[in-house]
Amino acid sequence: MNNQMDIGNPTRTRAILEKYGLSAKKSLGQNFLTDPNVLLNIVDAAEVSPEDDVIEVGPGIGSLTEQIAKRAHHVLAFEIDRNLMNVLDETLSPYDNITVVNQDVLKANVNEEVENHLDGKRRLKLVANLPYYITTPILKTFMASTLPIDKMVVMMQKEVAERLTAQPGDKEYGSLSVVVQYRMNTQIEFDVSSKVFVPRPKVDSAIVSLTPRAGWEVMPEDDKDFFKTVHGCFMHRRKNIWNNMQGLYGKEPEIKAKIQNVLDDLGIDPQVRPERLTVLDFIKLHNRIQIEGLKRK
């Protein structure tokens, strides 16, 4: 099948939308990608091969799904919009290695669907053009899952991509940066102009790759508790770490003494702002807080 016939070709996309009387649903964050080169570049960035089974979220009319299916062993796509199921039945009919389930991925038992539709013998990847309004929940769901995902390559709002990949000292660096980079290596692969979507969104996008980290030299006992510490430290970005910790744990003399002990032991300047601390700094900070017995108010 050549590019002229591909779903992602602008002419064919319009024809499909007209045939089915479709219009993008803002409530579901739908924007249809109509640039074949961008679609191919996404699949290239994911390094999809016949050795891979791929999970996709929000296939839409199948533009990206098709390109993934040309290279992957099998594609398991989650589509929340029931009205698109008949469309996908037609547009993806030439391919026998695609399974589309009509489910909200945030409510679905993804592990069960993977077990039912994929053989578990191949590498597992997530490749998707994510709805902007649920990008972060979807990423957190897959990062926290027990699925052995080898790589994620996802399109998202450029602003969110910059936050995910920001480094200490960057203005975009925040709790999301720390929480994601605690588990994943992140990299912006390339930017995507709003011009290549129908309808055209108000913001540009970016393709981000995420690969699992092996771990850190020290680890927190409980991830969720660690994340609460991180979010708490960033609650007031303009405040230094000393003031933020007092806001979290209290200002009583004995509490302030414990906070001072924590910072002194770690060599952290009390006047530094949280966006200057590395992921490892936050892990050590959290662990030391636990040892000191500090409890959030």
Swiss-Prot record:
It catalyses: adenosine(1518)/adenosine(1519) in 16S rRNA + 4 S-adenosyl-L-methionine = N(6)-dimethyladenosine(1518)/N(6)-dimethyladenosine(1519) in 16S rRNA + 4 S-adenosyl-L-homocysteine + 4 H(+). InterPro entries: KsgA/Erm (IPR001737), rRNA_Ade_diMease-like_C (IPR023165), rRNA_Ade_Mease_Trfase_CS (IPR020596), rRNA_Ade_methylase_Trfase_N (IPR020598), rRNA_adenine_dimethylase (IPR011530), SAM-dependent_MTases_sf (IPR029063). S-adenosyl-L-methionine binds at residues 31, 33, 58, 79, 104, 129. Pfam families: RrnaAD. SUPFAM superfamilies: S-adenosyl-L-methionine-dependent methyltransferases. One of its GO terms (cellular component) is cytosol. Belongs to the class I-like SAM-binding methyltransferase superfamily. rRNA adenine N(6)-methyltransferase family. RsmA subfamily. This is Ribosomal RNA small subunit methyltransferase A. It comes from Pediococcus pentosaceus (strain ATCC 25745 / CCUG 21536 / LMG 10740 / 183-1w). The lineage of its organism: Bacteria, Bacillati, Bacillota, Bacilli, Lactobacillales.
